[in-house]
From Swiss-Prot:
Species for this entry: Agrobacterium fabrum (strain C58 / ATCC 33970) (Agrobacterium tumefaciens (strain C58))
EC numbers, comma separated: 5.4.1.4
Keywords: Isomerase
Catalytic activity annotation: D-galactaro-1,5-lactone = D-galactaro-1,4-lactone
Similarity comment: family membership: Belongs to the metallo-dependent hydrolases superfamily.
Source species, domain of life: Bacteria
Known function: Catalyzes the isomerization of D-galactaro-1,5-lactone to D-galactaro-1,4-lactone. This is a step in the oxidative degradation pathway of D-galacturonate, which allows A.tumefaciens to utilize D-galacturonate as a sole carbon source.
Cofactor comment: Does not require a metal cofactor.
Transmembrane segments: none
Name of the protein in question: D-galactarolactone isomerase
Amino acid sequence: MSELVRKLSGTAPNPAFPRGAVDTQMHMYLPGYPALPGGPGLPPGALPGPEDYRRLMQWLGIDRVIITQGNAHQRDNGNTLACVAEMGEAAHAVVIIDATTTEKDMEKLTAAGTVGARIMDLPGGAVNLSELDAVDERAHAADWMVAVQFDGNGLLDHLPRLQKIRSRWVFDHHGKFFKGIRTDGPEMAALLKLIDRGNLWFKFAGVYESSRKSWPYADVAAFSRVIAAHAPERIVWGTNWPHNSVRETAAYPDDARLAELTLGWLPDEAARHRALVENPEALFKLSPVKAT
């Protein structure tokens, strides 16, 4: 099998991204940080690092980025923090914490640019829902957010735990409803009620990981449109770069076309602007973009 080649340039998204656009979901890697036991290996092909991502930012029109701790590094945040330092003021981190994370640890992580913690309740994840209470306690005290990922078809089972989250939090990857979700079903009703509580956002990212169909992912589009129409102030967007589940060059997404598709599920241009700028500023407590 030939080495994976990632597409990093092309025709820009139409309409163009607004000034201050935030990519809220991606991973980045530097040499010297091997994969750890319990998680997947490092991404295929050449290690996707800061220089590659800067090309993607220029192509798409991204100004700010949230670098999310990858599963390959499990509970060692060293790679993610090094990437944030390399990217400078444009970048912040979502990292792994648990019940052993001290207040001093939290202070150091915050000083290094961390704005959130990750829960990944799927195979290969470092910290799952069983540790949510401890993660939420620390995140809330630090004014961080929590990124939560699990099989969305278990939403009703997890509801009592999710209703207790005090931090701002985001339901990752279009909810990952692997068995699908009816727009008039109980899971959708429960999700909209959770959003209405005021501290939950919904992330448009990695649609191909959640869909049971091929492009244009009509199944995910149907319920994503409902959520976006219900609460346009609660939608955030991410590239999910470098698309770690993709193994072949021929299957590698065109990030501009993928962004056009998923952002097109928002009800209007004002909602698109909010999803790219104001909503992530609220979720991650980012400083607002200064007017020119």
